[in-house]
């Protein structure tokens, strides 16, 4: 899991490349699924890590500036709180790469984050996938696109990470047609996904029906 996402986030043409010159600070509590992967990546890469304690918008922004934080992740509600606070203090956040998950990031929120200088993209996953399956990417050749097109790219579900086998299937487990119209359930396989639920064999069996983890999400 950790090595897979290090490989995926360290490629040179990836807009959110995570490398040993970054300074990492999580913007979500450690008990949240957001905190289950990146701290291990940061440790393996030898990255400086900052852990804020109380999650107060002003304190988080102060630490980002004081510690020169360059890489983080959070849910949309936390990002909105930071942006609201930064309207008052007007810190330069142009060095910050931020991954958003937990719920969909709206185009308006992404645009507001960009107006504050934050390099923000969406990711998709769930607690059972610990945490990411996919992440939005802006390849180097697309970085001169219009702001409108870039916002679209930033808010997309993105592409599967390394070692992730992702499918969208119908009720018969057949892959749906890729026509931007047909929908089905998102199912996944990867080495780090949960095996099941404690003391709930039936739910665990249903989760992995057909050899894939069933997200219950429509794609």
What positions do the PLM features span?
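Alpha-helix capping/helix-boundary segments
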Residues: 5, 56, 78-79, 105, ...
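Conserved AMP-binding/adenylation subdomain of ANL enzymes
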Residues: 5-23, 31-70, 85
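Thr-Gly-centered strand-to-loop micro-motif
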Residues: 26-27, 51, 99-101, 156, ...
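AMP-binding (ANL) adenylation modules
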Residues: 28-32, 125, 191-192, 210
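Gly/Ser/Thr-rich phosphate-binding loop
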Residues: 44, 69-74, 83-152, 165, ...
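Conserved ATP-binding/catalytic segment of the ANL
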Residues: 157, 178-179, 185-219
């Amino acid at each position: 899991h950790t090595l897979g996402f290090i490989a995926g986030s360290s490629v040179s043409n990836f807009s959110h490349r995570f490398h040993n010159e970054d300074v990492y600070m999580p913007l979500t509590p450690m008990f949240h699924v957001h905190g289950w992967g990146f701290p291990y990546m940061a440790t393996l890469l030898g990255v400086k890590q900052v852990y804020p304690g109380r999650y107060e918008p002003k304190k988080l922004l102060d630490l980002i500036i004081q510690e020169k934080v360059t890489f983080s992740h959070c849910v949309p509600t936390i990002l909105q709180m930071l942006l609201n606070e930064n309207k008052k203090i007007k810190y330069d956040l142009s060095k910050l790469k931020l991954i958003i998950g937990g719920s969909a990031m709206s185009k308006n929120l992404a645009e507001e984050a960009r107006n504050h200088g934050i390099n923000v993209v969406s990711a998709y996953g769930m607690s059972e996938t610990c945490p990411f399956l996919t992440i939005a990417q802006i390849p180097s050749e697309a970085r001169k696109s219009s702001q409108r097109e870039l916002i679209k790219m930033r808010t997309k579900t993105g592409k599967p990470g390394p070692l992730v086998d992702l499918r969208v299937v119908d009720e018969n487990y057949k892959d749906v047609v890729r026509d931007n119209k047909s929908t089905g359930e998102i199912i996944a396989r990867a080495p780090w996904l949960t095996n099941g639920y404690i003391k709930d064999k039936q739910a665990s069996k249903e989760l992995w029906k057909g050899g894939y983890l069933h997200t219950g999400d429509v794609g």
